[in-house]
A protein has these predicted regions:
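A short glycine-rich beta-strand->turn/loop micro-motif centered on a GG-aromatic cluster
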Residues: 109-112, 131-145
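Histidine-anchored nucleotide/phosphate-binding helix
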Residues: 1-2, 119-129
Length: 177
């Protein structure tokens, strides 16, 4: 439903390497500081290229149906959260902000995983990177933990994101602009 509201579609997804420096085997060891500058927390294996977890979620368009694609976290040294930069320090652009500017985007609608890390960081990067409105579709997001998800919603809203419940609410919002 969200894709039908867009003139252009962007796909971003993790594409991790089996030798990533931030990997841990046990979920109990997840989300602990790594001491690394471009991979701040430990994570269990996810979105490893060539695995089921690397694929797009059921119901999403195929990769070739998107207008712009970002694969992030390919380098085993880097574990970025946002879709706009390949690194946590936000020095290595993925080109997404530049592409959106070239397309004269005025509104960006965001949904994805995980609300409290990748979605939040992407939304904050988009808000800093352009003059467009950033709308977040809550129904199209899932997070890691309820406490950090709630904090992420508040942080995105405080930064200027328009957080709406679902695609129906987004359509209503857009039609009233």
């Amino acid at each position: 439903a969200q894709a039908a509201l867009a003139d252009l579609r962007v796909m971003t997804k993790d594409a991790h390497h089996a030798a990533a420096k931030w990997l841990v085997d046990n979920p109990v060891d997840m989300l602990k500081p790594t001491g690394l500058s471009d991979a701040d927390l430990t994570w269990v294996s996810h979105a490893m290229v060539g695995t089921y977890g690397y694929g797009l979620l059921d119901g999403l368009p195929s990769t070739k149906e998107y207008d712009y694609c970002v694969w992030k976290g390919i380098d085993p040294e880097l574990h970025p959260y946002g879709a706009c930069f390949h690194d946590i320090e936000e020095k290595l652009s993925t080109g997404l902000i530049e592409w959106l500017r070239c397309q004269n985007a005025d509104t960006v609608i965001v949904g994805g995983l995980a609300t409290d890390y990748c979605v939040k960081t992407t939304v904050l990067q988009l808000l800093k990177g352009g003059a467009w409105k950033v709308i977040v579709n809550q129904a199209a997001c899932r997070g890691i933990a309820p406490e950090t998800v709630e904090s992420a919603w508040q942080e995105m809203h405080s930064a200027g994101a328009i957080v709406l419940e679902n695609a129906k609410e987004i359509k209503k919002y857009i039609n009233n602009q």
